[in-house]
């Protein structure tokens, strides 16, 4: 294929990463730069994909896999590179955050899930979201890329939100807290589970918003908040990666 960039956008498969994994590896072997928003290949084979990209001297961009249009990975990798990330935690799945926000309004889990499905936030079979798989996949990508770990989905201690009761949500509210599905990386331990979070905590956002707080060795805590999903938002992430690859190609040509 006479192209400088291959964009891989097939549906996410968290079991074995296919067919996206084969698409990406084939493109890399033919020395094509690759962009993807597919979490599957990255959650099962991140270290080997980075190694293959480096071996073939190509650019591999995946900023849309975490946060969609909100540049969570880019923020951490670029803006925080003068410091050291000690740990991070946040809300990485907009669907579950929408459901838990609705439960704060008094809806049961099933009622909130139905509302999310009607609005198009949740799939007819919503297991990837409500059982924490989506958040875990994003956590794996962040841990590998930002913390230098070599982990896969099975390394995450994962609990979804299906057992969260409206009464628990109400009790948390009485204390000025909210129950959120929090993904965290601390002391090389990866956890996704419902947790009580203070309403005053910057990561305590509602609706379909995502949020991540990075704890730094010198600069304290830095938080990024934004919309985590959606067609236009994800498309903007692909465009962002395309622009960066284009700029790098132009710079290389000018250098020589």
Region spans (language model):
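Conserved active-site and cofactor/substrate-binding residues in soluble primary-metabolism enzymes
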Residues: 1, 19-22, 44, 67, ...
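Hydrophobic, small-residue-rich alpha-helical packing segments that form membrane-like cores
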Residues: 1-5, 26-29, 118
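N-terminal Rossmann-like NAD(P) cofactor-binding module of classical short-chain dehydrogenase/reductase
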Residues: 5-7, 11
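Rossmann-fold NAD(P)-binding glycine/threonine-rich loop
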Residues: 12-30, 37-77
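Predominant activation on well-ordered alpha-helical scaffold segments within soluble catalytic domains
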Residues: 25, 50, 73-77, 96-101, ...
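Rossmann-like NAD(P)H-binding beta-loop-alpha module
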Residues: 54-123, 129-134, 141
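Catalytic, metal-anchored helix/loop core of enzyme active sites in primary metabolism
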Residues: 87-89, 97-100, 115, 121-124, ...
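Substrate-binding/catalytic subdomain of NAD(P)-dependent oxidoreductase enzymes
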Residues: 102, 113-211
